Amino acid sequence: MVQLLFKFLIQVGATFVELSRNEIGNKNLLLLIHHAGSLLLSMFGSFSNYPVQKFLDMLDERCLTLIASEFDSYFENLVKDRVGNYVVQRLIWGFKRTGIDLPHSLTSVLVTRSIHLCKHRYGYQVIEAFDRSTRLA
């Protein structure tokens, strides 16, 4: 079962960008991610963030912006999460890689809450990644 799931994720990952550009493929991918994400989380626990991080490495700026807009409502919780902070760091580096700015809604959370997040056990890692990405810009 585990090998089949990984094989499936690799095949989806290989065509993720192409599928996300197609309107029907994009809707199906969004549904798939929600179900596959919960399945991965239940099967692998904290290691389920690795496939998500790999997907973020492959995406172009349009897809990254779409995913960042999905994070809007619970972005601070992701930053503070033991596993979610790694996904947010990868998202920040994805924006840096593509040469576009992190959306204002996410940047404002990082800037306005930076003192609080710097004191947080996991939040400080995201603040450091954000600082490095803005310094290197």
Swiss-Prot record:
Keyword Cell membrane: no
One CC-aspect GO term: cytoplasm
InterPro entries associated with the record: ARM-like, ARM-type_fold
Gene Ontology BP terms: regulation of translation
Principal location: cytoplasm
Keywords for this protein: Cytoplasm, Repeat, RNA-binding, Translation regulation
Pumilio repeats: 70-105, 108-137
A GO molecular function held by the record: RNA binding
Subcellular location: Cytoplasm
Domain remarks in the Swiss-Prot or TrEMBL record: The pumilio repeats mediate the association with RNA by packing together to form a right-handed superhelix that approximates a half donut. The number as well as the specific sequence of the repeats determine the specificity for target mRNAs.
Function according to Swiss-Prot or TrEMBL: Sequence-specific RNA-binding protein that regulates translation and mRNA stability by binding the 3'-UTR of target mRNAs.
Official protein name in the record: Putative pumilio homolog 25
Source organism of the structure: Arabidopsis thaliana
